[in-house]
């Protein structure tokens, strides 16, 4: 359960920049264009807040585990009589299976990982050197590091770094022996991205029709007028939005797909009442992650149930839900309160990230 909760919370609170940051930033930029075509949301827009968030979530998960889940687990399972062989994910020594060898790393694979790890560290050192050394050709106007192309176009940087790392690993392990092997591996890697490419084709059409019909602007204007008339306190508005995201996430488990549906409405609407897109995006992430572990629609929910049944064969959806819910509620409430403290302190969510947008 700890691993399940941590992977859910870590989905939107990673210490390292990942594909989620790139996808959400791209969608937010497209949505902000309904109000300001020149507005651009950086993939690093939430990075300053996300790093301490990972620590806060780790502490919250630890607290829930120690104060509640451990006692609940002892009620469900007598740990003095657990069949370790049946519950483990490894096969006992006296049973041989053809898949065992596939789970073990060969000597050349271990060496490849070590060499690639060192290579990545070298690339990171070079990246930060080019970013911060005075006189670097990659610095932005007035030698501003945060306006460097290495920051604004970090998606390309990540792509190049992973391509180079994969190439090094392939050469060290000799899984790449000729130039013809590279396109083959690239094609194989793209297989996992095809569903995402199809999704974003549909999303791009949706956004284009939304802009063509002016429905996005109309919805944003009417929504902002309603919010202004209600004069709702900002913390309450934030809380209701987070709860809305969590509720929708019970049905749409793909973070990027859900944001693609919500962003064209909420981002322009919040901009018109003075809330920057980066703030709206972070609120979305707070509502999205914790809800992932309580929706049966998620494939990981079924996977977690299978793992749970190895220890407690009577476990069903209700059992997993009762164990997941304390984590989800605690993470959502604790993370949201941490965000409010950060927001009202005036600290930026990321490098060069505004907290407000000129209303109107």
Features from the language model and the residues they span:
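Hydrophobic core segments of alpha-helical transmembrane domains in multi-pass membrane transport
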Residues: 6-14, 49-67, 117-132, 157-170, ...
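Membrane-core helix-loop-helix motifs of multi-pass transport proteins
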Residues: 1-77, 283-285, 301-341, 347, ...
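Hydrophobic alpha-helical transmembrane segments of multi-pass integral membrane proteins
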Residues: 197-206, 210, 229-268, 272-273, ...
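Interfacial loop-to-helix junctions that mark the boundaries of transmembrane helices
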Residues: 40-52, 107-114, 141-158, 228-232, ...
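Intrinsically disordered, low-complexity non-transmembrane regions of multi-pass membrane transporters
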Residues: 69-111, 355-360
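Core transmembrane alpha-helical segments of multi-pass membrane transporters/permeases
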Residues: 147-217
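Short helix-coil transition sites and intra-membrane helix breaks within transmembrane domains
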Residues: 15-19, 174-176, 208-217, 248-261, ...
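Hydrophobic, small-residue-rich membrane helices and short re-entrant helix-turn-helix hairpins
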Residues: 98-114, 139-145, 171-193, 314-322
């Amino acid at each position: 359960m700890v691993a399940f909760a941590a992977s859910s919370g870590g989905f939107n609170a990673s210490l390292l920049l990942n594909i989620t940051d790139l996808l959400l930033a791209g969608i937010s930029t497209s949505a902000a264009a309904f109000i300001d075509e020149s507005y651009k949301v950086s993939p690093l827009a939430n990075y300053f807040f996300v790093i301490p968030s990972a620590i806060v979530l780790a502490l919250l998960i630890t607290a829930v585990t120690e104060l509640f889940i451990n006692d609940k687990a002892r009620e469900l399972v007598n740990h003095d009589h657990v069949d370790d062989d049946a519950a483990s994910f490894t096969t006992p020594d006296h049973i041989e299976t053809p898949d065992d060898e596939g789970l073990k790393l060969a000597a050349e694979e271990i060496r490849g990982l070590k060499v690639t790890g060192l290579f990545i560290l070298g690339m990171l050192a070079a990246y930060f050197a080019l970013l911060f050394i005075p006189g670097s050709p990659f610095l932005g106007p007035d030698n501003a590091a945060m306006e460097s192309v290495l920051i604004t176009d970090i998606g390309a940087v990540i792509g190049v770094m992973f391509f180079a790392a994969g190439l090094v690993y392939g050469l060290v392990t000799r899984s790449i022996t000729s130039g013809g092997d590279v396109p083959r591996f690239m094609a194989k890697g793209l297989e996992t991205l095809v569903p995402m490419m199809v999704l974003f084709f549909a999303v791009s059409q949706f956004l284009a029709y939304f802009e063509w019909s002016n429905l996005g602007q109309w919805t944003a204007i009417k929504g902002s007028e309603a919010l202004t008339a209600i004069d709702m306190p900002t913390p309450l508005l934030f809380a209701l939005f987070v709860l809305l995201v969590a509720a929708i996430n019970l049905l749409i488990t793909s973070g990027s797909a859900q944001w693609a549906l919500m962003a064209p409405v909420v981002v322009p609407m919040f901009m018109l009442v003075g809330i920057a897109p980066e703030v709206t995006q972070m609120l979305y992430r707070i509502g999205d992650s914790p809800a992932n572990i309580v929706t049966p629609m998620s494939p990981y929910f079924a996977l977690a149930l299978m793992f749970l049944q190895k220890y407690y064969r009577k476990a069903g959806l209700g059992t997993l839900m009762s164990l997941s819910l304390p984590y989800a509620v605690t993470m959502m409430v604790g993370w949201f309160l941490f965000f409010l403290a950060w927001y009202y302190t005036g600290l930026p969510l990321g490098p060069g990230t505004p907290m407000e947008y000129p209303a109107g």
